[in-house]
From Swiss-Prot:
This is UPF0310 protein YdcG. Coiled coil: none annotated. InterPro entries: EVE_domain (IPR002740), PUA-like_sf (IPR015947), UPF0310 (IPR022996). It comes from Bacillus subtilis (strain 168). Belongs to the UPF0310 family. SUPFAM superfamilies: PUA domain-like (SSF88697). Pfam families: EVE.
Length: 146
């Protein structure tokens, strides 16, 4: 089974809730982005702001985790808001500014309009980029099944 590596674009405040609860929620609770991920895939969160929608600019990678089972489930947060979630094993890390490692990332060099890529809310990256970001975030990757 091939492992895929993903970026999810979410405010830091929402990332922290997901990390504390052991789940991922993307693109305002849509199911489709979660359905692209499977057990054993990796997710790194990029947070453009500290809070949604008008928080202070952050532009940092803020969390990293591995997809547990790949089972997607609805979760009622409010009477009219039932987003989809996916369980994630999060790893200890520290946030790292995007501009601190931008020049080392392949997806940056290969993308003409970087803003469009981030606005998608979820996209795949190479294993090399994953390792670059993970190491910059202080994640101990030795011995991890990648």
């Amino acid at each position: 089974m091939n492992t895929n590596y993903w970026i999810g674009v979410v405010s830091e405040q929402h990332v922290l809730k997901g990390a504390a609860g052991g789940f991922a929620q993307l693109c305002h609770g849509k199911k489709a982005p979660l359905a692209k991920m499977k057990e054993g895939d990796w997710l790194i969160y990029y947070s453009p702001r500290d809070a949604y929608p008008d928080g202070k600019l952050l532009r940092s990678f803020t969390a990293i985790g591995k997809v547990k089972s790949g089972n997607i489930y609805p979760y009622q947060m409010a009477p009219n808001f039932i987003p989809y979630r996916l369980d994630i094993d999060y790893y200890p890390c520290h946030k790292i500014g995007f501009y601190d490692i931008k020049s080392k990332l392949e997806f940056v060099q290969e993308t003409k309009h970087l803003g469009f890529l981030f606005r998608r809310g979820h996209f795949e990256i190479s294993k090399k980029d994953f390792l670059t970001i993970a190491q910059a975030m202080g994640v101990n990757i030795s011995g991890m099944a990648l």
